[in-house]
């Protein structure tokens, strides 16, 4: 049975994935699936750098604005929804193009990841949640480092839910989450062209800093204030970079200037972690866009890899 063709564009935040994906979708008769775990949330537009209607330019986008901020969302649900979109887009004679920066989510779609339906150990989970509240997220993250350093490296301390899930897997099965994933990383389920964008680090960091300034000008403070005033607390959504820092400001833990500075720092660190993840976990063909766009070059590469003809070459 012939595998479905999928183009995937990955790279750190602010590197220019959105524009490239739309240009490629136009040329390759494609439709776009967001591979970002935070763009799924409604009303969280500015802080997630969500693609706008104007930017979409008529290209259908999926996995955007599908959940309310107070709702949780799992990798397993992402996997199920995206695979359904891939199937439906392919059936319409279009090319699915996955775009994003959340490595584990994208990887879970492309490879044969199995997610167990067992409830785990609710008592142990509650104990860990209590520890996180009483002794801090870093304490729980350190416990994960002791039993599963690879997962601890991959999962940020502030993502308490996933930290506790990894601990719970080890507690119930005696097996590391990282080992479980490693077993499932061998075979691609699709005929994939995996493209990565990179650029000079200083230039990327300058772009990230500028993006944060633009977000503030566009109304990020008001966007986060709206969530805060709705009473949204301790939710998966507000762990996102761009929200947790501004929440600290509304909780009077830092000044606005300090919050913005921390947002820039966290965004730069996240970009570095994204690049490390993709380079270590995926067989990516990288294109350096320091000196400008490489749209034509990338288009030719995808055409060759997936044996496609673009609208430009017809």
Curated annotation (Swiss-Prot):
Gene3D superfamilies, per the entry: 1.10.20.140, P-loop containing nucleotide triphosphate hydrolases
Needed cofactors: Mg(2+)
Superkingdom classification of source: Bacteria
List of residues binding ATP: 11-18
A Pfam family of this chain: IPPT
Interaction with substrate tRNA, annotated site positions: 102, 125
Broad class of enzyme this protein falls into: transferase
Similarity field: Belongs to the IPP transferase family.
UniProt-recorded name of the protein: tRNA dimethylallyltransferase
Alphabetical keyword list: ATP-binding, Magnesium, Nucleotide-binding, Transferase, tRNA processing
Function comment: Catalyzes the transfer of a dimethylallyl group onto the adenine at position 37 in tRNAs that read codons beginning with uridine, leading to the formation of N6-(dimethylallyl)adenosine (i(6)A).
EC number(s) reported in the record: 2.5.1.75
